[in-house]
Amino acid sequence: MKIRNLLTVLAALVIVGGIYVFAVSRPDDARGAITVWYVEGGTMSNEFVALAAGYNKSISRASLPVQCVPFADEDAMAAAFDTQAPDLVLCSHYRAFDMHARGKLTGISAALGDNAPDYPRALSSRSACIGASYFPVGAEVQVLFVNTTLTAGRDLTTLEALSAAAEEYRTETGKPFYAAADYAPLFFTEYLREGEEFDAGSAARSSKVYKHIYNLLAENAYTGALSLTSGDEVSAVRAGELGCAVVGTTALPKKLSLGVSVLPVPPLTAAGGEGELGEAWGLAVVARGSRSTGDISAFLAWLFSSNRDTRLALQTQLVPARTSSLITRDALWSALIALNTGEIVALPPADSDFAANRADFERDIRARLAFLAQ
């Protein structure tokens, strides 16, 4: 009888011990998690997932880990919102602004308190959700990618000067001097600097700014100084086939080799102001069904400290959204950091006229320039 009672006690201890072992060794997702939805293979996705894994290793068991949930594309992620919702979404400002307009985002400024990231006013003024329910990490902008050997001694400080330099180079070598990967963003940026709004619609062609830009491009296309060959403009500059090219930052090489550099897109004229078109990427706070915004704000406070957000932006070839104190010897990183001057970064919403007309404008301007080049 005593033996039977002893075995019963031992069995009970084993069960209790098993429960205890399970409680302290169970996987993190059994405790719940901060869910982050993202498009697999999208901008910043791989780098963000790696950073989130680092966060999970650094926290105590009292904090919720981050669980990254991939989707095949934007449509698949949008469809998932019909039945469920995450805590955070890694997305561009286009999606974030749309969600904000439909009341789908949750402000967590109070939960962040003094840990809220500070953004330049020129950026934070783009939307009320920035810094409250949407937290940009970086932005893609157009830059001038330059072959320093071919452009040595040539004036690239304005679009007018660049056009003139292209004609000189064409006369000297018989070769094209520059190219542009996309024209619509270039027009948008130049309009912004001239104090006008570019909607990419047909009425835009009546603007003096449009005619000024178009005439410069048209002359260069007619003489062959502007390359209209669609392809890898970055490789052409690196190989010495072009002196420079207007490209997006995500098209730049991961490392800048000797003989190339990155400059801001030049203003139309010396009297031009500041501003540029950007596409921001960051985290939108949905927090639907979340037990607390405390864990979400703890993760965001961690992300936007110790230059982690800056490094994440630079790793994905974006201009950091916030002014950075990061010191680096990497030439590309230094160039991207220098591009954040606190000037106006225009972030048009997805339902803007520019977004609606952009593709048609791009096709039209390319067709016009190609006709002149024949």
What residues fall within each predicted segment?
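Short, solvent-exposed loop/beta-turn-alpha elements that line the ligand-binding surface or hinge
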Residues: 110-118, 195-212, 267-275
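Extracytoplasmic/periplasmic solute-binding protein
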Residues: 133-137, 142, 161-203
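Conserved N-terminal structural module of periplasmic/extracytoplasmic solute-binding proteins
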Residues: 1-95
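Glycine-centered hinge/linker elements that transmit conformational signals in sensory
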Residues: 199-231
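Hinge/lid segment of periplasmic solute-binding proteins
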Residues: 91-145, 154, 161, 262-265
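A ligand-binding cleft/hinge motif common to bilobed small-molecule-binding domains
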Residues: 94-100, 238, 246-260
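Extracytoplasmic/periplasmic substrate-recognition and gating elements
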Residues: 256-319
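Long, aromatic- and glycine/proline-rich binding clefts that accommodate carbohydrate-like moieties
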Residues: 311-367
